[in-house]
Amino acid sequence: MKRISLFSWVLLVCFNLSAQKQPVTAKLSDNNSFSMILLPDPQSYIKFDVNQPIFELMTAWTANNKENLNIKAVLCTGDLVEQNEWPVPDNVNGNQTSTQQWQSVSRSFERLDNKLPYIVCTGNHDYGYKSSENRFCQLSKYFPVERNNKWKDCLVSVGKNWEGLPTLENAAYELELDNWGNILVISLEFAPRDEAIQWAKDLVDSEKYKNHKVLLLTHSYMDEDANVYEKEGYKVSPANYGRTIWERLVYPSPNIKMLICGHAGDVGTFDRHVSYRIDKNQSGKNIPQMMFNAQTAGGGWHGNGGDGWLRILEFMPDGKTIKVKTFSPFFAISPTTAEHAWRKTDIDEFEMILE
């Protein structure tokens, strides 16, 4: 009996040591829901070494809450790094070389490897030297198609980049989900070329996916005032921007139900980091379009990278409603800051209906 009691006591101690207790725990509003986690632009976490652990905390938290939140996928709005190919940092707009930045963001996503399918898109800072001077991108070096075994069951199409090589710059992922049927998430490159838009259009029009609910993820689409970009001033060419993405891809496609982007933002109140609009597609259905990019929330462009803010997208059992909540694992881990872990205003917590 003494041996059994001692063994039980050791098990209890080990369990308590391994199960970290946090002041704030995120929960679904319905036990029959599932969720996706939306990570905003990582670049300002990644460009400074002292900020990098915050982004890794966000991905670690996501992995640890896989069961609790019934997480099915993780989305990231792009700008994985601040400079794609810059060997000498200026110590103003970052103190990390491009190699160090790519290594850091890769290390953060290792927290999700072989646990969850994560879907990233490329931003303007992921191309060229500093910001889309050309189409050169290091994504495929650090995020090859074979990297995460959770992609094996869901990665269904990989488009070609500007060099004609298949990479995750343009990729599609199929998720079979209770109450929601088949969802196709398409990640579209920054300022997509005609070929990239046509690849996505052919995919959504195909017999195989015409009855799927399609979620489009792309880096740049609209600004912080929810104005869809007509054009942007980057050197990369050829390129298309928000208005063309809408007119040639989203508007005529009855199965594209929602668009998510990042990129935009300004220093100031939190409403400068987010925007939202609804427009009708060619079939007369409402299409929610959501921009989320919290990177200046933690002290501006040279602050801590965004205070750890992410969004929990709860897909309700009715098969059409998504509850959006804005949460910071960074604030949630300490009793000192736990009261700030949720943002509760109308721009931070709302519902989207997919028609």
For each predicted feature, which ranges?
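Active-site environment of divalent metal-dependent phosphoester hydrolases
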Residues: 45-47, 82-84, 122-131, 168-171, ...
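A short C-terminal boundary segment appended to hydrolase-like catalytic domains
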Residues: 30, 303-355
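Extended active-site neighborhood of metal-dependent phosphoesterases/phosphodiesterases
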Residues: 86-198, 209, 269-291, 311-314, ...
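Active-site neighborhood of phospho(di)ester-bond hydrolases with catalytic His/Asp-centered motifs
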Residues: 38-40, 72-79, 117-123, 188, ...
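Bacterial Sec-dependent N-terminal signal peptides
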Residues: 1-22
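N-terminal active-site segment of His-dependent metallophosphoesterases
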Residues: 19-97
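Conserved beta-sheet core of the metallophosphoesterase superfamily
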Residues: 237-317
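Active-site-proximal segments of metal-dependent phosphoesterases and phosphodiesterases across multiple
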Residues: 90, 94-98, 195-198, 207-257
